[in-house]
């Protein structure tokens, strides 16, 4: 009877197993089976497939095409190019006058275009000038970049009902610098104006004489000045519109020999730049001394006119000068 009780107690204390075990071997077997069971459970849990999350089907968004824009250098607002063209390149937020190409300026100024003058002239390279690249190569790059053959464009046409000759510098073309072709075109513009007794209007924007042509460039200052004098003697009006910027040999010649000088707001006008003058005289100069408004206050120019009023202002002045 005792033996049976011992058998029952031993059977109840032993773990369930397929084979009989006893003593320390039983404890080790229990630990191994428990560890195996836990390892098997963990592996099976990790190997379970991750359920997919149900998502609402949304339409695929594509990139929205935006119109090219330009940042205003004054107020840093972004303006679409269409809005700039419609507003004559004047910022609608701060009224800053942005740069225009010569052709855009003239086509917006004239009501009717009859002919373009000076296309037969082409630049030569008599000095075989080389800076960072040969002069002919630089000219080719500028022509490709701007779509123009030179820094001055001359158009003959009408402003309202008045026959005029108008020319404009393109600052993109080597800084609007004046070389022999620019001089040739301006002289031809003056001669056509003289022949047709039509007023001459010049929109100036230049860094000065073109260094790549040396003394030939400087000679254009004398040629253009002589052509303007012939207009004056014949009583033909010559109006200069000073845009931003006008410097150097252009300021010292054709840009300051007009019967009337008009400037756009905040245009920079001078012979040498502020830094060069300060280094020469060794003095700190007043900041706005080359601004159009400062020059107007000191009697250097006659008017500062907003770009939107430029056409009407020039026409009224010409009507008075020609007694129309």
Curated annotation (Swiss-Prot):
Main location: cytoplasm
Ranges of compositional bias, category Low complexity: 1-16
Region span, Disordered: 1-51
CoA carboxyltransferase N-terminal domain sequence ranges: 68-324
Quaternary structure annotation from Swiss-Prot or TrEMBL: Acetyl-CoA carboxylase is a heterohexamer composed of biotin carboxyl carrier protein (AccB), biotin carboxylase (AccC) and two subunits each of ACCase subunit alpha (AccA) and ACCase subunit beta (AccD).
Role this protein plays: Component of the acetyl coenzyme A carboxylase (ACC) complex. Biotin carboxylase (BC) catalyzes the carboxylation of biotin on its carrier protein (BCCP) and then the CO(2) group is transferred by the transcarboxylase to acetyl-CoA to form malonyl-CoA.
Protein name per Swiss-Prot or TrEMBL: Acetyl-coenzyme A carboxylase carboxyl transferase subunit beta
Species name: Psychrobacter sp. (strain PRwf-1)
Name of encoding gene: accD
């Amino acid at each position: 009877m005792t033996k049976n009780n011992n058998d029952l107690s031993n059977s109840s204390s032993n773990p369930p197993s397929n084979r009989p075990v006893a003593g320390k071997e039983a404890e080790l077997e229990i630990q191994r089976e428990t560890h195996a069971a836990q390892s098997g459970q963990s592996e099976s849990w990790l190997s379970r497939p991750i359920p997919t999350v149900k998502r609402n089907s949304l339409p695929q968004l594509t990139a929205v095409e935006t119109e090219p824009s330009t940042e205003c250098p004054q107020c840093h607002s972004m303006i679409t190019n269409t809005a700039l063209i419609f507003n004559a390149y004047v910022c609608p937020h701060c009224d800053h006058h942005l740069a225009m190409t010569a052709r855009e300026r003239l086509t917006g100024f004239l009501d009717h275009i009859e002919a373009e003058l000076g296309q037969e002239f082409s630049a030569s390279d008599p000095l075989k000038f080389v800076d960072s690249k040969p002069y002919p190569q630089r000219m080719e790059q500028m022509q490709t970049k701007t779509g123009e053959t030179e820094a001055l464009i001359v158009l003959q046409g009408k402003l309202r009902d008045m026959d005029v000759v108008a020319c404009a510098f393109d600052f993109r073309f080597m800084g609007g610098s004046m070389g022999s072709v620019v001089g040739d075109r301006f002289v031809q513009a003056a001669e056509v104006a003289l022949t047709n007794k039509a007023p001459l209007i010049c929109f100036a924007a230049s860094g000065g004489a073109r260094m790549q042509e040396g003394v030939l460039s400087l000679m254009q200052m004398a040629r253009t000045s002589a052509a303007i004098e012939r207009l004056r003697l014949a009583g033909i009006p010559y109006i200069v519109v000073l845009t931003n910027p006008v410097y150097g040999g252009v300021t010292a010649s054709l840009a300051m020999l007009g019967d009337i000088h008009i400037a756009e707001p905040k245009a920079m006008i001078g012979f040498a730049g502020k830094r060069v003058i300060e280094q020469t005289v060794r003095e700190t100069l007043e900041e706005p001394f080359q601004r159009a408004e400062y020059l107007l206050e000191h009697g250097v120019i006659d008017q500062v006119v907003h770009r939107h009023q430029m056409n009407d202002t020039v026409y009224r002045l010409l009507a008075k000068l020609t007694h129309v």
